[in-house]
Amino acid sequence: MTIRMPNDRQRILVLGKTGTGKTCAAVWHLSQKDFKRKAWIVLNHKGDDLIDSIEGANHVDLNFRPKKPGLYIYHPIPDVDDAEVTQLLWDIHAMGDIGVYVDEGYMIPNRDPAFQALLTQGRSKKIPMIILSQRPVWLTRFAISESDFFQIFQLGDQRDRQTVQGFVPVDLEKLMQAPVNTVPALKKFHSIYYDVGANNCVIMTPVPTADAVLARFDLGKKRKQTL
């Protein structure tokens, strides 16, 4: 069965507890973007090594604003840099036609007005989004309700499964829960992939390895900017 990938206006929410392959899958989605035609920003609150290993990405300060295509990685400190992140997101909202990757959605406060504006208005402004979270119960509801695609890995907490359950047409408890010493129906590194617009839901096999995903990026010589 052929499955669709998010286009340059759509957003995907990638969920899963630590160690499920969530970040590798999200970076795999990111690797499919055309950085020669569009700028993407990455909010790497957790300092994820896989993200920081992308060759050719620009590592920039929070006061930097992209003016040309490419990949720009920011490293905000949770709580400390919240105001700067809000201003950055407002500026992206005003500029439009820039992709946004958020390494952990709950690192942005639930009521952040700029984040909510991107989630609710980003489609019309050509602002696609890739949002990750290991705890969907802590996410703003708009991150879930406004998603065009879901990729859901194993979620260990029942509250997280219940938070997402109303948005996907499969029984998450049945797929993710299993008696002691048995294997859940949703295998390791496999995920539930749901295309909301097409109402198409499949079990996706593991994405390529981290090294293979990193090799997909073609961004030229790696450099860091402090502006």
Swiss-Prot record:
Entry-linked Gene3D superfamilies: P-loop containing nucleotide triphosphate hydrolases (3.40.50.300)
Keywords of this entry: ATP-binding, Capsid protein, Nucleotide-binding, Viral genome packaging, Viral release from host cell, Virion
InterPro entries: P-loop_NTPase
General function of this protein: Together with the packaging efficiency factor P6, forms the external part of the portal vertex that is embeded in the capsid and which plays critical roles in genome packaging and genome ejection. Both proteins multimerize as a single ring-shaped heterdodecamer arranged around a central channel.
Localization terms from the record: Virion
Positions annotated to bind ATP: G16, K17, T18, G19, T20, G21, K22, T23
Membrane-crossing residue ranges in chain numbering: none
Gene: IX
One GO CC term on file: viral capsid
Record protein name field: DNA packaging ATPase P9
